[in-house]
């Protein structure tokens, strides 16, 4: 059974919330891609819509929206995600993950695009990050 840590970012309050997703709800995330909009009920936010913005796999490699499938590849990168150059024109070969969620993904980053009736703090508790 897959298990994910879903980070829900609230752009209105500038806070983020981390939710553990297991079982059938985690199965619903497999096969989704970066940019897909999912139902918030998966993470305990009924009435909300969440957009997948990225994530990391079990070894900490970041997902990139321009690589298709759940594959891990080594690319020559000149900018984010996956590499932040320190000098202008710097490039480096880095390992990154594709844009599709698989069982190897551990963390899924999302942002709220449509709000429900109840506030997020009431449904998920107090946010940990600012």
From Swiss-Prot:
A single Gene Ontology CC term: ribosome
InterPro entries: Ribosomal_eS6, Ribosomal_eS6_arc, Ribosomal_eS6_CS
Keyword annotations: Ribonucleoprotein, Ribosomal protein
GO biological process: translation
Xref: SMART domains: Ribosomal_S6e
Entries under Pfam families matching the protein: Ribosomal_S6e
Keyword Ribosomal protein: yes
GO MF annotation terms: structural constituent of ribosome
Region span, Disordered: 78-98
Entry's family note: Belongs to the eukaryotic ribosomal protein eS6 family.
Protein name listed in UniProt: Small ribosomal subunit protein eS6
